[in-house]
Amino acid sequence: MSTKYTHLFSPIKVGGTELPNRIAMMPMGVFSPRLLDPKTGAYTKDGADYYIERAKGGTGLIVTGVVPIIPMPGKNPVNFPDEYVEKMRYLTEGVHKYGSKIFIQFTAMTGRAAHITNEIEWKMLPAPAPIQNVWDPTIQNRGITKEEIKKYIENFAQAAYLVKQAGGDGVEVHAVHEGYLLDQFAISFYNKRTDEYGGSLENRLRFAKEIVEAIKAKCGKEFPVSVRYSVRSYVKDFNRGALPWEEFEEKGRDLAEGIQVAKMLESFGYDMLDCDNGSYDSWFWPHPPMYMPKACNLKDVQEVKKAVNIPVVCAGRFDDPELAEQAIEEGKIDIMGMGRPLLADPELGHKFYEGRLEDVRPCISCHQGCLGRIFQGRDISCAVNPACGREKSYALTEAEKKKKVLVIGGGLGGMEAARVCALRGHEVDLYEKTDHLGGVFVAAATPDFKEDDRHLLAWYKKQMKDLPIQVHMNTEVTEDMTKGYDEIFVATGAKERKLEIPGFDSPHVTYAFETLRDGSIQIDGENVLIIGGGLTGCEIAYMFAREGKKVTIVEMTETILNAFGLSAANYNMLMEILDYYKVKVIKNAVVEEFRDGKAIVAETVKNYPNVANRAKLMFALGPQGMKVKHEIPADHIVVSVGYLPDDRLYEQIKGDHVYLIGDAKRPTNVMDAIWAAYEIAKDI
């Protein structure tokens, strides 16, 4: 079978190794002991199976997640060379079985970006020179010594040699990228050394230069060495990232220096530049949420490609084979890099080759199953693919006994339950009381930055058509209709929480679901007030602010964006967006009344002397602080205060083999709904 993506599926040489196609799996951290041996730093069989599954699916190059080579106990191949080589052969042989190649990524670790834990003390993870920690600015990471630098370089070379012995095809140096240690050395904003590793750009890159020279000396010139590389930093200041559309003064690496560094990395002997953008101070660039444009790094990476003669990879919300084919054909890049999309669908390579794009299960850039779980110290996985990282134990098998399964509700949880049961051979009926599938997710997917949510919804609808599932629309299930089924999934969703507030019977008050479902509520006037500073409320605020409205968020607690499972990358970008659009946030406050185009807001303020002058009215001082009333102009109010489970039918029929899932059990997020359905359905 031929493919229309002839450039994407053409071979390419990296150093002395030829890749079968131009699709590369990008490195993502795999730290849990179930996937990465805490002693040797070799991948366990579960960890290896995770990568092998992507090779099986048609990925040409696998680049593994970071493995430390720093002089510390455990997770260091150099300390256990024979054991490491033996364990790694299962991975390399498994990847080669499908014709793919594999590079193992080694890291000099995080420097100032270290999470300080009981296991990893701050003194173990030095920065180039004393500097404030990313996560706790009250802590200063110490400066690394020259003796330590020498040891790091030796360990990189020795670890690379072990990979070669284990049958690996190359290594990747982590990283002049994302504000990790080598990147901190490379950028003057972070590197304040005064010796030969600081000052000039040549000095700041000396560490990266000596690493590749040592690897080549140990493994031979033909042994491929890639480097993970962030072209631009997009840093406004410590812990302040720049948005794609804003003008700012770059504190990190700008594009001109990024091109210069790329040329120097090539001259040092690196065989491939694995490119993205960003830093820990602009974390939403290396880990782009749905608010980022698609292929957000391509415009910068293509400038690097013009300047070098080694293969260049581009990653970052880059999941469109049409765009990749065009970019490769036009010489803008050499290789399409994907991370999260391959977690969501490990068969991407084959589906791209065959042109089956509608069968691709999309990444929705939520970070809940991948980055979020990594930073909780848990296994890497995926919100829309529960089997990710558990390829063998979560693999679907044919059911020993075929059963009649009833699924009540056609939201994501209900459709996932129906899909899995049908794949396992059960007889499935799905009932949906409305005229559409998707439940509240239909409204959530409405904003233009949620295109992948809409793709996921379309994918589920296609599964319902392609699989032997009887779908009954516009039908509300009663207790009598549940008779005769062996297994029942109750996925009846949730009801929006309503507020009883004077004036809220106005047509100028809408709830989040209605506001999103209708696409865009037409508002006469410029002032919009959002009640509720959760994820949905803040995204609605963004939508209206982008239209030029003056937006105020009223939140009853002390924090906004306190959403279950929200990753730091998504949080940071949305907070920067709200700040950029000057969205006003009033915390510890409630709306008491809406009248005459104004909302009466009662705010509890502890620092009351600074607020008294801007208050219209004041209450008596209470034990928690002073209560201040504001009159906030509001031409329209959107209420976004969450949902309440709709478990009424479940309460009528609950018993053995009746499962309450999704928002009907607990309104949370996409991952919870899909995972709960999968984990039950895979075993019945």
Task: Show where each model-derived region lies.
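Flavin-dependent oxidoreductase catalytic cores
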Residues: 1-408, 412, 416-423, 427-428, ...
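Short gly/ser/thr-rich secondary-structure transition/capping motifs
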Residues: 3-12, 43-45, 387-391, 468-475, ...
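Hydrophobic, well-ordered secondary-structure elements that form the walls
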Residues: 273, 304, 327, 339, ...
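Conserved beta-strand termini and adjacent loop/short-helix elements that scaffold enzyme active sites
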Residues: 315, 385, 474-476, 512, ...
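Short gly/pro/ser/thr-enriched loop/turn and capping motifs at secondary-structure boundaries
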Residues: 342-345, 436-438, 559-561, 666-668
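Rossmann-like dinucleotide/flavin-binding elements
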Residues: 402-431, 472-480, 484, 491-501, ...
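Rossmann-like dinucleotide-binding cores of NAD(P)H-dependent redox enzymes
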Residues: 427-467, 543-591
